[in-house]
Curated annotation (Swiss-Prot):
The keyword Cell division does not apply. Residues 1-32, 84-344, 412-471, 485-508 are annotated as: Disordered. It comes from the Eukaryota. GO terms for biological process: actin cytoskeleton organization. Belongs to the phosphatase and actin regulator family. This is Phosphatase and actin regulator 2. One of its GO terms (cellular component) is platelet alpha granule membrane. The modification Phosphoserine is found at residues 16, 423, 522, 560. It comes from Homo sapiens. Binds PPP1CA and actin. The modification Phosphothreonine is found at residue 25. Residues 108-120, 137-147, 291-304, 488-508 have a biased composition (Basic and acidic residues). Residues 231-247, 276-290 have a biased composition (Low complexity). SMART domains: RPEL.
Amino acid sequence: MDNAVDGLDKASIANSDGPTAGSQTPPFKRKGKLSTIGKIFKPWKWRKKKTSDKFRETSAVLERKISTRQSREELIRRGVLKELPDQDGDVTVNFENSNGHMIPIGEESTREENVVKSEEGNGSVSEKTPPLEEQAEDKKENTENHSETPAAPALPPSAPPKPRPKPKPKKSPVPPKGATAGASHKGDEVPPIKKNTKAPGKQAPVPPPKPASRNTTREAAGSSHSKKTTGSKASASPSTSSTSSRPKASKETVSSKAGTVGTTKGKRKTDKQPITSHLSSDTTTSGTSDLKGEPAETRVESFKLEQTVPGAEEQNTGKFKSMVPPPPVAPAPSPLAPPLPLEDQCITASDTPVVLVSVGADLPVSALDPSQLLWAEEPTNRTTLYSGTGLSVNRENAKCFTTKEELGKTVPQLLTPGLMGESSESFSASEDEGHREYQANDSDSDGPILYTDDEDEDEDEDGSGESALASKIRRRDTLAIKLGNRPSKKELEDKNILQRTSEEERQEIRQQIGTKLVRRLSQRPTTEELEQRNILKQKNEEEEQEAKMELKRRLSRKLSLRPTVAELQARRILRFNEYVEVTDSPDYDRRADKPWARLTPADKAAIRKELNEFKSTEMEVHEESRQFTRFHRP
């Protein structure tokens, strides 16, 4: 059967337009035709470049590192990375969990399709239904499950696998290209489901199909889990086997929800019965894209929808009493195999040993109250559980299992027998399982990874998962590590690198240095000695002043003895002309004359012609050298 599933996976991945789930590199863009045409006209690019060995080795190392890179969810689960707060408004690309790994929704849908196809042979998974048909199915499952005892965690009566009915042409097994490719490639486009979900007053048209049974169970489990974390005590009261207890439980959940809605503005208020029931039915089919974080656009629309109802708390409690039956407008449901109960589907979703919880009287997913399913969209289901070791668990697994501490805090619930004691082992087992799975399952588009793999994969295998990764991230800060690794003075003294010295020894060393310096300074010659050696001149201010005065007198005497101009003329040393000759000259351009710049092509041709004529007729040339005469071109 595994081989068949593998074959289906490969076939569907090959046919789907989205990026392949197992690919290690993101899909690269095709080069346009222009670049190849351009190379034809560039002959210097024709020769094939030889790839260097270094380049090949580096690329091989990089591919190996990328193949062993762990997903962000894996690192959060191991406690290496802290989980960043979800940015509600900024999320443009919806990611979905598949067994602890983040992949785009387009990939997940193809993967879920394959699982549905392969498991249909076993009759274990029900096929996809539009949301209105699921509501009609809810009605049937309600009546079936009320007759059973609440304490029995057994399967509902499983029908034999029936042939898949002919769907409409839109609902092909692979979702339409717009749905998958749009979700995976264009992050800014919202899938059509989400627009239908918030349509204010009308019943929306049937949306294109999403991955069916596993996603609905995840949402149902997520809704029950989110109710636990919001702290509404009344919703968790154990339900009795009688049919009348169901509406009562739903009223309590509704009233507790109305209380929390009144206190916090961010919570949704449901206004009228068709809208609430329609929202709940859409919630069950809209896949995990709503669980992982809605775009800001849909949040705003839902918030406007809340504000249309004044005094919603009083109206809600009255209207929710009549809200339990689903809307009567529904086409006849196609024959379906009943879905697996919550435990079995959780096991198929996360193939790890887990502690399983079923809310109330272990009802299958389709039998859950629509008002409970409505809260699957609540952002409060983004809670993360912590195991005994303090590691955060990814959201998908958090919907399927819980820890001993939380079981003690919450109201009494039914556990699958024999698994309570294994909760601590199941966490460590799931960690090891995830560590093994990430190499095969991981894709390169799994959101931001906050570190880069600097070391070889061997180091990853050496240490245990958490410590090796933590040390790898710490190793990035090399300076801090080097400073932290510097040995202390005591260690250096212990290793005999530094000599151990007491305070007295240090004082003695200082005194020795001081005496050396004093001795050297005392050996310097004094100023008197230098003056005696005539190195330093004696300074006497009176003598200096006298020398200056003498210099001035000598200079002034020289200046006073200078002859006047008349004396110089008399001695005929200076001769002045009586007049100055002045000649007029025209102003002209002193740059060199360039006649060739003024010649036109016709002038040049005439000059060449004249030269040729002169050389051929008039110029005297020796007969033997006439052949060497150079003529200008005409």
